[in-house]
Protein backbone atom coordinates (compact mmCIF):
# COMPACT_ATOMS: atom_id res chain seq x y z
CA UNK A 1 0.00 0.00 0.00
CA UNK A 2 1.39 3.45 -0.90
CA UNK A 3 2.55 5.55 2.03
CA UNK A 4 -0.14 8.19 1.39
CA UNK A 5 -2.88 5.57 1.61
CA UNK A 6 -1.40 4.18 4.80
CA UNK A 7 -1.52 7.63 6.34
CA UNK A 8 -5.11 8.06 5.22
CA UNK A 9 -6.13 4.92 7.10
CA UNK A 10 -4.51 6.02 10.33
CA UNK A 11 -6.48 8.17 12.72
CA UNK A 12 -4.62 11.49 13.02
CA UNK A 13 -5.31 13.66 16.02
CA UNK A 14 -7.11 16.93 15.36
CA UNK A 15 -4.92 19.29 17.37
CA UNK A 16 -7.21 22.27 16.78
CA UNK A 17 -10.00 20.44 18.61
CA UNK A 18 -8.00 20.14 21.80
CA UNK A 19 -9.24 21.94 24.88
CA UNK A 20 -7.55 25.24 25.72
CA UNK A 21 -6.87 26.05 29.36
CA UNK A 22 -6.43 29.83 28.99
CA UNK A 23 -10.20 30.36 28.70
CA UNK A 24 -9.93 33.40 26.41
CA UNK A 25 -12.32 33.55 23.43
CA UNK A 26 -11.15 34.91 20.07
CA UNK A 27 -13.33 37.38 18.18
CA UNK A 28 -11.96 36.64 14.71
CA UNK A 29 -9.71 33.89 13.44
CA UNK A 30 -9.32 32.61 9.91
CA UNK A 31 -7.53 33.35 6.66
CA UNK A 32 -6.62 36.78 5.28
CA UNK A 33 -5.97 37.94 1.71
CA UNK A 34 -6.33 34.70 -0.21
CA UNK A 35 -6.75 35.36 -3.93
CA UNK A 36 -9.34 33.39 -5.84
CA UNK A 37 -10.84 33.69 -9.35
CA UNK A 38 -14.52 34.62 -9.33
CA UNK A 39 -17.32 35.48 -11.70
CA UNK A 40 -19.35 38.48 -10.58
CA UNK A 41 -22.88 39.13 -11.79
CA UNK A 42 -23.62 42.62 -13.10
CA UNK A 43 -26.65 44.86 -13.44
CA UNK A 44 -26.72 44.27 -17.20
CA UNK A 45 -27.17 40.54 -16.71
CA UNK A 46 -23.63 39.77 -17.81
CA UNK A 47 -21.02 38.12 -15.63
CA UNK A 48 -17.48 39.40 -15.31
CA UNK A 49 -14.41 37.28 -14.66
CA UNK A 50 -12.10 38.82 -12.09
CA UNK A 51 -9.76 37.94 -9.22
CA UNK A 52 -10.85 38.67 -5.66
CA UNK A 53 -9.01 38.92 -2.35
CA UNK A 54 -10.91 37.04 0.34
CA UNK A 55 -10.59 37.39 4.09
CA UNK A 56 -12.69 34.88 6.04
CA UNK A 57 -13.04 34.67 9.82
CA UNK A 58 -15.14 33.10 12.55
CA UNK A 59 -15.26 33.47 16.30
CA UNK A 60 -13.57 30.83 18.44
CA UNK A 61 -14.98 29.85 21.85
CA UNK A 62 -12.65 29.92 24.83
CA UNK A 63 -12.48 26.14 25.20
CA UNK A 64 -11.15 25.39 21.67
CA UNK A 65 -7.46 25.58 20.85
CA UNK A 66 -7.87 26.44 17.17
CA UNK A 67 -10.20 26.68 14.20
CA UNK A 68 -10.19 24.54 11.05
CA UNK A 69 -8.30 26.74 8.59
CA UNK A 70 -8.59 24.31 5.68
CA UNK A 71 -12.38 24.53 5.70
CA UNK A 72 -12.27 28.17 4.61
CA UNK A 73 -10.40 27.19 1.45
CA UNK A 74 -12.77 24.27 0.87
CA UNK A 75 -15.70 26.68 0.98
CA UNK A 76 -14.03 28.91 -1.62
CA UNK A 77 -13.31 25.93 -3.85
CA UNK A 78 -16.97 24.99 -3.68
CA UNK A 79 -18.10 28.37 -5.01
CA UNK A 80 -16.90 28.27 -8.60
CA UNK A 81 -20.20 29.64 -9.88
CA UNK A 82 -21.15 33.26 -10.36
CA UNK A 83 -21.06 35.27 -7.14
CA UNK A 84 -23.95 37.62 -6.54
CA UNK A 85 -25.18 39.39 -3.44
CA UNK A 86 -27.49 36.43 -2.76
CA UNK A 87 -24.82 33.76 -3.17
CA UNK A 88 -22.51 35.83 -0.96
CA UNK A 89 -25.13 35.65 1.79
CA UNK A 90 -25.27 31.88 1.31
CA UNK A 91 -21.48 31.70 1.69
CA UNK A 92 -21.79 33.49 5.04
CA UNK A 93 -24.20 30.83 6.28
CA UNK A 94 -21.89 28.09 5.04
CA UNK A 95 -18.88 29.53 6.85
CA UNK A 96 -20.76 29.64 10.15
CA UNK A 97 -22.15 26.12 9.69
CA UNK A 98 -18.95 24.42 8.46
CA UNK A 99 -16.83 26.04 11.18
CA UNK A 100 -19.53 25.49 13.83
CA UNK A 101 -19.29 29.15 14.82
CA UNK A 102 -21.77 31.63 16.26
CA UNK A 103 -20.44 34.45 14.10
CA UNK A 104 -18.55 34.78 10.85
CA UNK A 105 -17.08 37.46 8.62
CA UNK A 106 -16.22 37.46 4.92
CA UNK A 107 -14.73 40.29 2.89
CA UNK A 108 -14.34 39.90 -0.84
CA UNK A 109 -12.44 42.73 -2.57
CA UNK A 110 -12.09 42.88 -6.34
CA UNK A 111 -11.76 45.24 -9.31
CA UNK A 112 -14.94 45.75 -11.32
CA UNK A 113 -14.76 47.07 -14.87
CA UNK A 114 -17.56 49.17 -16.33
CA UNK A 115 -17.78 50.13 -19.99
CA UNK A 116 -18.38 53.86 -20.33
CA UNK A 117 -19.32 56.04 -23.28
CA UNK A 118 -17.62 59.41 -23.82
CA UNK A 119 -20.11 62.30 -23.54
CA UNK A 120 -19.65 63.83 -27.03
CA UNK A 121 -17.96 61.43 -29.45
CA UNK A 122 -19.50 58.29 -27.96
CA UNK A 123 -16.16 56.45 -27.96
CA UNK A 124 -16.21 53.60 -25.46
CA UNK A 125 -13.63 52.56 -22.88
CA UNK A 126 -13.37 50.65 -19.62
CA UNK A 127 -13.18 52.19 -16.15
CA UNK A 128 -12.11 50.16 -13.14
CA UNK A 129 -13.59 50.50 -9.67
CA UNK A 130 -12.41 48.91 -6.43
CA UNK A 131 -15.32 47.01 -4.90
CA UNK A 132 -15.81 44.93 -1.76
CA UNK A 133 -18.62 42.76 -0.46
CA UNK A 134 -18.46 42.75 3.35
CA UNK A 135 -20.57 40.23 5.21
CA UNK A 136 -21.20 39.48 8.88
CA UNK A 137 -23.33 36.70 10.32
CA UNK A 138 -24.27 36.31 13.97
CA UNK A 139 -26.50 33.55 15.30
CA UNK A 140 -27.80 32.85 11.81
CA UNK A 141 -28.62 36.47 10.91
CA UNK A 142 -26.54 37.82 7.99
CA UNK A 143 -25.76 41.47 7.28
CA UNK A 144 -24.23 42.63 4.02
CA UNK A 145 -22.49 45.85 3.03
CA UNK A 146 -21.11 46.95 -0.31
CA UNK A 147 -18.07 49.21 -0.54
CA UNK A 148 -17.04 50.94 -3.75
CA UNK A 149 -14.34 53.51 -4.47
CA UNK A 150 -15.46 55.89 -7.23
CA UNK A 151 -12.82 58.15 -8.84
CA UNK A 152 -14.27 61.52 -9.91
CA UNK A 153 -13.24 65.09 -10.72
CA UNK A 154 -13.72 67.89 -8.18
CA UNK A 155 -13.30 71.60 -8.90
CA UNK A 156 -12.77 74.16 -6.13
CA UNK A 157 -15.58 76.76 -5.78
CA UNK A 158 -13.25 79.20 -3.99
CA UNK A 159 -10.60 78.99 -6.71
CA UNK A 160 -13.25 79.65 -9.34
CA UNK A 161 -14.67 82.59 -7.41
CA UNK A 162 -11.40 84.44 -6.79
CA UNK A 163 -9.60 83.74 -10.08
CA UNK A 164 -9.92 85.85 -13.21
CA UNK A 165 -9.83 82.66 -15.26
CA UNK A 166 -9.62 78.97 -14.53
CA UNK A 167 -9.89 77.08 -11.24
CA UNK A 168 -7.88 74.31 -9.67
CA UNK A 169 -9.37 70.87 -9.99
CA UNK A 170 -8.22 67.36 -9.19
CA UNK A 171 -9.07 63.71 -9.13
CA UNK A 172 -10.98 62.62 -6.04
CA UNK A 173 -11.94 59.30 -4.52
CA UNK A 174 -15.43 58.95 -3.11
CA UNK A 175 -15.80 55.78 -1.04
CA UNK A 176 -19.28 54.56 -0.17
CA UNK A 177 -19.92 51.69 2.22
CA UNK A 178 -23.62 50.87 2.23
CA UNK A 179 -25.44 48.35 4.39
CA UNK A 180 -28.26 47.11 2.20
CA UNK A 181 -31.83 45.96 2.75
CA UNK A 182 -32.68 44.64 -0.72
CA UNK A 183 -30.76 44.00 -3.93
CA UNK A 184 -28.54 46.98 -4.70
CA UNK A 185 -26.20 46.77 -7.66
CA UNK A 186 -22.68 48.13 -7.39
CA UNK A 187 -23.35 50.04 -10.61
CA UNK A 188 -26.26 51.81 -8.87
CA UNK A 189 -23.86 53.22 -6.27
CA UNK A 190 -21.33 54.19 -8.94
CA UNK A 191 -23.98 56.10 -10.90
CA UNK A 192 -25.20 57.84 -7.76
CA UNK A 193 -21.73 59.11 -6.86
CA UNK A 194 -20.75 60.17 -10.38
CA UNK A 195 -23.95 62.19 -10.75
CA UNK A 196 -23.00 64.26 -7.68
CA UNK A 197 -19.37 64.97 -8.64
CA UNK A 198 -18.11 68.03 -10.49
CA UNK A 199 -17.63 65.61 -13.36
CA UNK A 200 -17.20 61.87 -13.79
CA UNK A 201 -14.08 60.23 -15.21
CA UNK A 202 -13.61 58.24 -18.41
CA UNK A 203 -10.94 55.85 -19.61
CA UNK A 204 -10.76 57.47 -23.05
CA UNK A 205 -11.65 60.97 -24.24
CA UNK A 206 -11.21 62.70 -27.59
CA UNK A 207 -10.76 66.47 -27.85
CA UNK A 208 -14.50 67.31 -27.99
CA UNK A 209 -15.04 65.10 -24.93
CA UNK A 210 -12.16 66.74 -23.07
CA UNK A 211 -13.68 70.17 -23.75
CA UNK A 212 -17.02 68.93 -22.41
CA UNK A 213 -15.69 67.45 -19.15
CA UNK A 214 -13.50 70.52 -18.48
CA UNK A 215 -16.45 72.87 -18.88
CA UNK A 216 -18.79 70.53 -17.02
CA UNK A 217 -16.51 70.54 -13.97
CA UNK A 218 -16.14 74.35 -14.16
CA UNK A 219 -19.92 74.77 -14.17
CA UNK A 220 -20.33 72.38 -11.24
CA UNK A 221 -17.73 73.31 -8.57
CA UNK A 222 -17.77 71.43 -5.28
CA UNK A 223 -15.79 71.44 -2.07
CA UNK A 224 -15.02 68.09 -0.48
CA UNK A 225 -17.77 68.97 2.02
CA UNK A 226 -20.27 69.51 -0.81
CA UNK A 227 -19.40 66.17 -2.32
CA UNK A 228 -20.04 64.05 0.78
CA UNK A 229 -23.20 65.98 1.64
CA UNK A 230 -24.70 65.62 -1.83
CA UNK A 231 -23.93 61.90 -1.91
CA UNK A 232 -25.40 61.55 1.60
CA UNK A 233 -28.65 63.19 0.45
CA UNK A 234 -28.93 60.64 -2.35
CA UNK A 235 -28.23 57.75 0.03
CA UNK A 236 -30.85 59.08 2.46
CA UNK A 237 -33.39 58.90 -0.36
CA UNK A 238 -32.39 55.35 -1.35
CA UNK A 239 -34.74 52.88 0.37
CA UNK A 240 -32.43 49.93 -0.28
CA UNK A 241 -29.73 51.47 1.93
CA UNK A 242 -30.08 50.88 5.69
CA UNK A 243 -26.89 52.60 6.81
CA UNK A 244 -23.89 54.14 5.13
CA UNK A 245 -20.48 55.69 5.44
CA UNK A 246 -19.31 58.06 2.71
CA UNK A 247 -15.87 59.63 2.48
CA UNK A 248 -14.32 61.94 -0.08
CA UNK A 249 -10.62 62.51 -0.56
CA UNK A 250 -9.44 65.24 -2.92
CA UNK A 251 -5.85 64.79 -4.09
CA UNK A 252 -5.26 68.54 -4.12
CA UNK A 253 -3.51 69.84 -7.23
CA UNK A 254 -2.16 72.97 -5.47
CA UNK A 255 -1.13 71.35 -2.18
CA UNK A 256 1.01 68.40 -1.14
CA UNK A 257 -1.81 67.01 0.97
CA UNK A 258 -5.37 65.79 0.50
CA UNK A 259 -8.66 67.32 1.61
CA UNK A 260 -10.96 64.85 3.36
CA UNK A 261 -14.55 64.65 4.60
CA UNK A 262 -16.70 61.86 6.03
CA UNK A 263 -20.37 61.30 6.87
CA UNK A 264 -21.79 58.24 8.62
CA UNK A 265 -25.50 57.63 9.13
CA UNK A 266 -27.69 54.75 10.30
CA UNK A 267 -31.20 54.88 8.84
CA UNK A 268 -32.45 51.85 10.79
CA UNK A 269 -35.83 52.61 12.28
CA UNK A 270 -36.51 55.57 10.00
CA UNK A 271 -39.66 55.36 7.85
CA UNK A 272 -39.17 54.58 4.18
CA UNK A 273 -39.25 57.69 2.01
From Swiss-Prot:
Pathway: Cofactor biosynthesis; 7,8-dihydroneopterin triphosphate biosynthesis; 7,8-dihydroneopterin triphosphate from GTP: step 1/1. It catalyses: GTP + H2O = 7,8-dihydroneopterin 3'-triphosphate + formate + H(+). Disulfide bonds: none annotated. Its EC number is 3.5.4.16. One of its GO terms (biological process) is tetrahydrofolate biosynthetic process. Gene3D superfamilies: Urate Oxidase. The record marks 156 as: May be catalytically important. InterPro entries: GTP_cyclohydrolase_FolE2, GTP_cyclohydrolase_FolE2/MptA. GO terms for molecular function: GTP cyclohydrolase I activity. Keywords: Hydrolase. Converts GTP to 7,8-dihydroneopterin triphosphate. Belongs to the GTP cyclohydrolase IV family. This is GTP cyclohydrolase FolE2. It comes from Alkalilimnicola ehrlichii (strain ATCC BAA-1101 / DSM 17681 / MLHE-1).
